[in-house]
Amino acid sequence: MSVKLACYVTASVTVATLMVCFMTMSTIYSEVDGFREKLDTEMNVFRQSTNGLWKDIVVIGRSSKRVRRQYEETNATPTPHADGSPSAPPGQPPAVPPVFNQPKTPNGANGNGPTCNCNADNKCPAGPSGPKGVPGVPGLDGVPGLDGVPGVGADDIAPQRESVGCFTCPQGPVGPPGALGRPGPRGLPGPRGQNGNPGRDGQPGHPGEQGSSGQIGKIGEPGPPGEKGRDAEHPIGRPGPKGPRGDQGPTGPAGQNGLHGPPGEPGTVGPEGPSGKQGRQGPDGTQGETGPDGRPGKDAEYCQCPDKSPPSEAVNANRGYRNI
């Protein structure tokens, strides 16, 4: 049901889009036609204006037949010296200043103002340009021109339009990026897509961690006794050659302490060591026993007895002998 609805909606949108396109094309065609008519009208007005200007130019050209003034240098103005005389190159005659004929009446009877009577034989070089003159009096209106000759009848020719082909302008430089526009309206949901192809099997994963040991199962029933096997042959071979000596094994653990051995023989007497420091003074010992009597001593020297002295000096009477 959803696929049919989507088809109907798509068809209706397509028809509406085509109608809008046709209306837009008709509008553009009408605008182009109006622009063409406006351009033709402006071209007709421009053609009439140019025809009128051309007639005015022809009339002015016929009426402006003025006699040219016969002089070679129109802007010849001699440069005066300090004394007021005009300058002239050496070896040439001085220039003759122009003589203006003054009008007979104050306002000029002839209406043309003063006239210039220049010397035609003057060969002086032209002087610097003079100042700009006063604008002249506007001239009289020209005589109306003659009527033109009637034109020859033209043949009936269909107007040919100028065919201008389209031309392609060179691509200009890339402009700066525009501002971010507003998000457009949400479009219609599209038809349901087809089922994708089934994916391929992935690579096997890494082995997981070892699980915990399960409970011990029940002991199975003993199986039936098997058939008797064949007698095996057990040949005894000769011993092989002695192999190479192996590497030294690691150091074994320390053994138990052994028994005390017998005392050894006394060694040789070593050299006398240095004298030690004097030790601290020990405590006084106990008083010893009285010793035996000593031997008789030597005879003492006889001293002269002192004189008799008063009783105060009798104290020193026992000092008459000295021991040797």
Swiss-Prot record:
Cellular component GO terms, alphabetical: collagen trimer
One term of GO molecular function: structural constituent of collagen and cuticulin-based cuticle
A single GO BP: collagen and cuticulin-based cuticle development
Record's keyword terms, sorted: Collagen, Cuticle, Disulfide bond, Repeat
Keyword Disulfide bond: yes
Subunit structure and binding partners: Collagen polypeptide chains are complexed within the cuticle by disulfide bonds and other types of covalent cross-links.
The protein's name in its UniProt record: Cuticle collagen sqt-1
Source organism of this protein record: Caenorhabditis elegans
Organism lineage: Eukaryota, Metazoa, Ecdysozoa, Nematoda, Chromadorea
Gene (name only): sqt-1
